[in-house]
From Swiss-Prot:
Family, as annotated: Belongs to the universal ribosomal protein uS3 family.
InterPro entries: KH_dom, KH_dom-like_a/b, KH_dom_type_2, KH_sf_prok-type, Ribosomal_S3_C_sf, Ribosomal_uS3_bac-typ, Ribosomal_uS3_C, Ribosomal_uS3_CS
Coiled-coil blocks: none
Protein name: Small ribosomal subunit protein uS3
PROSITE patterns from the UniProt entry: KH_TYPE_2, RIBOSOMAL_S3
Gene3D superfamilies reported for this sequence: 3.30.300.20, Ribosomal protein S3, C-terminal domain
Gene Ontology biological process: translation
Amino acid sequence: MGQKVHPRGFRLGLSADWQAKWFNEKNYKEWLLEDEEIRKFIKNKYYHAGISEIYVERPDAERINITVKTARPGIIIGRKGAEITSLREELERKFNRRVVINIEEIKTPELDAQLVAESIASRIEKRASYKVAMKRAIMNAMRKGAQGIKVMVAGRLGGAEIARREWYLRGRLPLQKLKAIIDYGTATAWTKYGTIGIKVWIYKGDADI
């Protein structure tokens, strides 16, 4: 029986990059938990900013460099940088380290798998048809230049008694090709019938490796 591997972990160092760049044998567990806390804190605080990924880099034990990839940088930066300054100061108090925050704008959110998954989840939570939400996401991604996209939803779809999963695929999705640039994202929609899981794969072409 075939086993599926995470599309990002499969390509680390080739066409994908690490979300955490540091190594510390002594404080590994502490730093790992801190990284997760940082990501949850920023995602929850700026839920409507369209945050896709948060990278954490630690040049030394006293500094944390955070890079936030977002579709709406203005929400995090704020007027004259007031919001990002407030965020930096809050993180410095929370973790007792010097924090540097960099913001990277996502130019085409339609090609970001995490944002696409969260968009579908949001539509389902607002009682939109899951099929319409999936097809619209696929259409937008292909129109913006994706070479392939797969969207899968699983759960009590449409309030059905028995949970099932459905998926749509458009274009190519070479999951076994290492140099293929495949973006992957997941999200959860909370409905009155239970949770619905969403997975999105987007193929953007091949990396030069």
